[in-house]
Regions:
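A sequence-composition feature that detects small, non-aromatic residues
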Residues: 5, 9-12, 22, 47, ...
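Negatively charged, low-complexity tracts enriched in Asp/Glu with abundant Ser/Thr
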Residues: 1-58
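Generic serine detector
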Residues: 33-34, 48-50, 64-66, 73, ...
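Intrinsically disordered, low-complexity regulatory segments enriched in Ser/Thr/Pro
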Residues: 58-104
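Generic detector of leucine side chains in alpha-helical contexts
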Residues: 4, 14, 38, 57-59, ...
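Arginine residue identity/basic-tract feature
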Residues: 16, 41, 45, 51, ...
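Generic marker of "main functional regions" within proteins
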Residues: 21-25, 29, 69-71, 94, ...
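Ampiphathic alpha-helical segments that act as solvent-exposed interaction surfaces
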Residues: 88-127
Length: 127
């Protein structure tokens, strides 16, 4: 079994350089061991270790049938679009869920979601 918190943080570090990331469960009583239904906050720090709260993300991982899906959004910024990643990426308005174009700073999030989903799909086949 993989440590999802480590996988998520490492993927965020790779795709959102030069920032460093930590993964915190949204609900204290939930762990980070299952991809069936996971909801975490990805906290961001700059190279000197200072918190970059406006760069923090929320990640939800869930299954739909046998498929793994991800929802990635900026924390406490409902006006920012959110990314759904299943077979393909879909950007949606954070306030109404309607489809929209990717934001100018969305490419690292798409890369992160794509890479993370590929790792989770690969791992779920091994389990």
């Amino acid at each position: 079994m993989i440590d999802l918190a480590v996988v998520i943080a490492h993927t965020a570090d790779l795709c959102r350089k030069p920032y460093q990331h930590a993964v915190i469960p949204i609900h204290e009583d939930e762990g980070t061991s299952s991809i069936d239904d996971l909801f975490v906050r990805i906290e961001t720090r700059d190279a000197s270790g200072s918190r970059m709260e406006d760069m923090d993300l929320e990640l939800e991982i869930y299954r739909s049938g046998s498929d793994v899906n991800l929802m990635l959004s900026w924390c406490d910024q409902a006006e920012r679009p959110m990314l759904w990643q299943g077979q393909h990426p879909v950007w949606m308005h954070g306030d109404n869920g309607m489809r929209c174009t990717a934001p100018a700073d969305g490419q690292p999030l798409e890369a992160m979601a794509r890479r993370l989903r590929a790792q989770l799909v690969s791992q779920s086949r091994l389990d």
